[in-house]
Design a protein with these regions (language model features):
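Eukaryotic intrinsically disordered, low-complexity regulatory linkers and tails enriched in Ser/Thr/Pro
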Residues: 1-91
Length: 91
């Protein structure tokens, strides 16, 4: 059985650093974009909830696929397990 890959994608949007997790990433047919599908978010059963994580869940709630400009991407890692998606201010 082939293991499912999980990717951590870090990119900049509107002066903020987004850190999201997804199961699928592809080079898009649209020149200069990366396709991201099957977003992964942590469970809601935590006692302390990060507001930026909740903002991301709301922002990507009904999104099937997102196209991120290649120039906005800072880093892509293949990780063993997903973490909490978050938004940070750029310094």
């Amino acid at each position: 059985m082939k293991d499912k890959k999980i990717y951590k994608i870090i990119f900049i949007q509107l002066g903020e650093i987004y850190e999201i997790f997804a199961k699928q990433i592809f080079q898009s047919d649209m020149y200069g974009f990366l396709e991201v599908e099957e977003f992964i978010f942590t469970n809601d059963d935590q006692l302390v909830v990060d507001p930026s994580s909740e903002k991301l869940k709301t922002e990507f709630n009904k999104v099937k696929r997102s196209y991120i400009p290649i120039g906005a991407i800072q880093r892509i890692d293949e990780v063993i397990e997903s973490g909490e998606a978050k938004i940070k201010k750029t310094s």
